[in-house]
């Protein structure tokens, strides 16, 4: 999203300004590499950026998932971003109904600006499978626990 990632200390190479996609989970591999620990364990999430000897990311994923709020997803490449927001709020079990979600693909410099929305089979073929894979575990397809929905007004101060 344009956030800065900076590491400074003994043994940290001076890389200057680097234009590379990173994710917050990359910090584990970055710090592990800089501290001299092995970073190839299969349980270790993240990516070592190319500037530190790893591989450049093709895309990053960020999301906002809080019960009582709409779900938001961004899948970003260097040049484009898929942005998604559900109409329904995230349920207390962490699932959400994606029916009617607003989805658009935009140039990175114009995210969420509808005048810049792109409709391209090539971009859809890249972004849609990645977004689907990411939300597969939280999509409830409109099926939810009825007792939980009945209790929602009490939990959220009268809001359905």
Predicted regions mapped to residue ranges:
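Substrate-binding rim/cap in mid-to-C-terminal beta-strand-loop elements of soluble/periplasmic
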Residues: 1-54
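Generic alpha-helix detector with strongest preference for long hydrophobic helices that associate
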Residues: 8-12, 29, 63, 108, ...
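C-terminal accessory region downstream of the catalytic core in glycan-modifying enzymes
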Residues: 32, 79-160
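C-terminal cap/loop subdomain of S1 sulfatases and analogous C-terminal strand-loop tails that border
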Residues: 33-110
